[in-house]
From Swiss-Prot:
GO terms for biological process: translation. One of its GO terms (molecular function) is structural constituent of ribosome. This is Large ribosomal subunit protein uL2. Residues 254-273 have a biased composition (Basic residues). One of the primary rRNA binding proteins. Required for association of the 30S and 50S subunits to form the 70S ribosome, for tRNA binding and peptide bond formation. It has been suggested to have peptidyltransferase activity; this is somewhat controversial. Makes several contacts with the 16S rRNA in the 70S ribosome. Part of the 50S ribosomal subunit. Forms a bridge to the 30S subunit in the 70S ribosome. The gene is rplB. It holds the Pfam family Ribosomal_L2_C. Belongs to the universal ribosomal protein uL2 family. The lineage of its organism: Bacteria, Pseudomonadati, Pseudomonadota, Alphaproteobacteria, Rickettsiales. InterPro entries: NA-bd_OB-fold, Rib_uL2_dom2, Ribosomal_uL2, Ribosomal_uL2_bac/org-type, Ribosomal_uL2_C, Ribosomal_uL2_CS, Ribosomal_uL2_dom3, Ribosomal_uL2_RNA-bd_dom.
Length: 273
């Protein structure tokens, strides 16, 4: 996929850079693999804001993605590559030999007409899904499981991948894009290749309104608030906050480590950079 620039006939087009989607499917998604999705506006079941600056946005249909790849030893053909508004990666509609359809994350270089399969004996080919114990060291992977049978959780965003760097004592060692080295059980599945749409990181939305279409509201600075709303708020005239940066609840921010899950720390061989 290439990037698309525009002639500046309006101010919002001057800086706009988008991913060229001309090669993607232009019709509607497969109805049997979609469902409605409710907007939360960043609120939880008590109505309290748990994710700031969310709300509005274009109505979407959720595409049901197969992260587990549980149809073993049944080959499938790629019918089309589609845009998915719910994620940065593209998705592929595949049709199995028994007639069943499914959506999977589309890796780079997967094209219409290609065949994919989930099997222990599958070839090391783009889009095929295998247990880590059957994949040679040095292979680039995506959609990697962390628990057997739970479905892929690692490397699902546009352009991402992990590298298989070792196997030992029932675990595979994978290297993440962040520089972290992590242990994953050898029976966990992973898919060959890198995720599609690597140019996603280079886009420029061009105007605030386009962010609103995506469901993002304005990010208000703490120093622009009142004292009741934020520790940085208040003061006579414009102030700098008067203290080290903190969250609305007073905890240090901008670099302070916040990871709490010590239970899984034993699976991290080397921390991220």
């Amino acid at each position: 996929m290439a990037l698309k620039n525009f002639n500046p006939i309006t101010p919002s087009l001057r800086e706009l850079v988008q991913v060229d989607k001309t090669s993607l499917w232009k019709g509607r998604p497969l109805k049997s693999l979609t469902k409605g999705i409710s907007k939360t506006g960043g609120r939880n079941n008590q109505g309290r804001i748990t994710s700031w600056h969310r709300g509005g946005g274009h109505k979407k249909l959720y595409r049901i993605i197969d992260f587990k790849r549980n149809k073993i030893d049944i080959s499938a053909i790629v019918e089309r590559i589609e845009y998915d508004p719910n994620r940065t990666a593209f998705i592929a509609l595949i049709k199995y030999e028994d007639g069943e359809y499914s959506y999977i994350l589309a890796p780079q270089k997967l094209s219409v007409g290609n065949r994919v399969i989930s099997s222990q004996d599958a070839d090391i080919k783009i889009g095929n899904c295998l247990p880590l114990k059957c994949i040679p060291i040095g292979t680039t992977l995506h959609n990697v499981e962390m628990q057997v049978g739970k479905g892929g959780q690692i490397a699902r965003s546009a352009g991402t991948s992990v590298d298989l760097v070792g196997k030992d004592s029932g675990y595979a060692q994978i290297k993440l894009r962040s520089g972290e080295f992590r242990l994953v059980p050898l029976d966990c599945k992973a898919t060959i290749g890198s995720i599609s749409n690597p140019d996603q990181k280079n886009i420029n939305l061009g105007k605030a309104g386009r962010n609103r279409w995506l469901g993002w509201r304005p990010h208000v600075r703490g120093v622009a608030m009142n004292p009741v709303d934020h520790p940085h708020g208040g003061g006579e005239g414009k102030t700098s906050g008067g203290r080290h940066p903190v969250t609305p609840w007073g905890f240090p921010t901008k670099g302070k480590k916040t990871r709490k899950n010590k239970r899984t720390s034993k699976f991290i061989v080397k921390k991220r950079k």
